[in-house]
Amino acid sequence: MRRALLGTLRRTFRSGHDGRSDEPQPPAEPPKAFYLVGEPGYPNYGDELIAGEWLKFLAARYPDTPVVLDCARPGPAAVILRDRHPHAVFTDTLRRLATENPFPYDGPIDDIAGFVARALRDDGVAPNYACGIRLLQHDVQSVHVLGGGYMRGDWTCNLSRLSIGPWAREQGIPAVGTGIGLMPISGDSLDYARRCVAAFRSFTVRDAATYDALRADKDAAAVTGLAPDDCFINGLDGCYMPPEGLPDTMLCVQSDFVDDPAALYARVERTLERWNVGKDAGIGVVECNPRIDAPIFPYLRDRGYANLRFFPTVELLERGFPARPGQRWISTRYHPHILAAAAGCSGSYLSVGPDYYGVKHGAVLRMGSRWTQIAMTGESPMPGEGFADQGIVQRYRDDIRRSVNGIHPDA
């Protein structure tokens, strides 16, 4: 506002009292930036998918408005998402404030979040990041915390990013959150999240457990809604790899969050046998998190599976997700479940952690998947069907766009 006012005064002074002048006029002030908070850059496919889809949306609707995306690894994120928006800048201001402070990493939320809040108000609290803080203070028109599962109760450094909501309200900057999952969360972390969420103009979550936890507080309940995953913002247009040559059977099986990966892989192998997938059948192994999702490939190879194809993370990021109708999937991960089920694939999921991945897979079932769950004991089920209503993807797109009316009224 101050810069715009000064620009108006300068133009009036040059033009004289009648407001006319033959002199060239200075260029108009550039619009203030959309400020996004997310988690692309590790990479971990779903986070890049969500951030990339929002950047595509903003590039199509507001091509001349700059975007700042605040994430933990802005360097890799900038390269991965380099073609999504013509005026995107990547930074890690909030992440740095959350991790470079006097308190232990993932220590008490009130300590870490208190530091973040003080620094946002006074850049002298964190002078190394004063430029990023001042950008927030002076050059931002809205704040949008993107969806994902990167904030939860025990990841307090990540969770402290919600402090941007109360700060934005103090500054008169509209803030929204979309498609967020906070589970597992309880105690001080939940109290903190409720206080922060109440300051947002709107705040949608992707799972019922997060929804119920936030709505137990009346102020947070007033702005909290239950929504689909952010990946649907553009109706999944352009998210898939060309279907030609993709295997009929696909796996995405992680090794993190698992006490005994070998037992998990053995369970997957027994499920393949139950589904009559022979050792000469084509099987795709999808990696969403580099190295973390790869070990099942040598496990199956060593057991005689001879027609395996590996899909590394970089291929997904560059070419899209390898799902097509007619496939059968086994996945421990959340976004492969969403994208494959939405594409009409049948499948089953394994939950490697009931309070985290169990909540995630439950959210996909609510969104429309009919996949079956594979338990670690007993006979594996046959695969369940994907989304019954293919039109729901477009309705989800419209729902998400309506949820950001507070910052994009023409969305």
Identify the function of each model-found stretch.
Residues 1-411:
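Active-site anion-handling motifs in enzyme catalytic cores
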